[in-house]
Amino acid sequence: VGIYGITNGVFVLGSSPVELADGTFRQPAEHVLFPGDYILAVNHHAVTSKEDLTVLIQKNETVSMVLTILRGNEQIDVSVTPVLAKTGENNKLNYMLGIWVRDDMAGIGTMTYYDDNGNYGALGHGIGDGETGELLKLDKGYLYEADILGIKRGQRGDPGELEGVISYRKTSMLGTVRQNSDIGIYGKLNDEYINEIKDKNKPYLMGFKQDLKTGEAYIISDVSGERQTYHIMMDSFDYSPSDRNKGIHFYVDDERLLSLTGGIVQGMSGSPIIQDGRIVGAV
């Protein structure tokens, strides 16, 4: 599936110096804004996108402005003053804070399961920012259809990845994202999509920690273009891991998957792990 998320406010990646008209450099947001901050409002005007932030900065010009930010779990106000700085190849002057920001994310992952009520779990890990490593706080998100166009094989030192495209058509939306956690994303599927896939899926019992055992198991993936079951060997378990994403250690011994991908590649995250007819985990 394709995953698209919109952040809660504007996410700060970092700050950097900007060049003023006289050729000197200033860094207005230094020691004020930090990677991982979320800008929620400017002078008490809500900010939901990069465009909102840009417009409000331009309106404020070089007057000190109050930013309402979320830092960790604490909401605070900070003050920062924009500067008139050069931008682009033509050195056009704009009011700037000298910050790098983002307001959305997109990627491809695998849905692990859904229940009779259409509640699903996917991805097997949280959606984090690639620059800061921070788990993103999402205001809302959506699942879309995705097509796999190719596979970059994994090799030592390079995990490889599935290469694909997400269809953002309204008719391609499969559901919504309600929670982004460190062990996966969770949400609700559309009724239309549930009706479309209900006869194509096999129900499994839910497994518990005490059901795990070393030895053979399977993962389910459509990495080949159609859904397949691939053999793996469960090697060891950590029932109280410091990282909740690393409780199961297994290796792939299915030659079909090894020849296709070289093992587990990015984009296969969330593939269900099946042992003795139960879903016992996710890649």
Named regions from a protein language model:
Residues 45-56, 77, 228-231:
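Short, Lys/Arg- and Gly-enriched loop/turn segments at beta-strand edges
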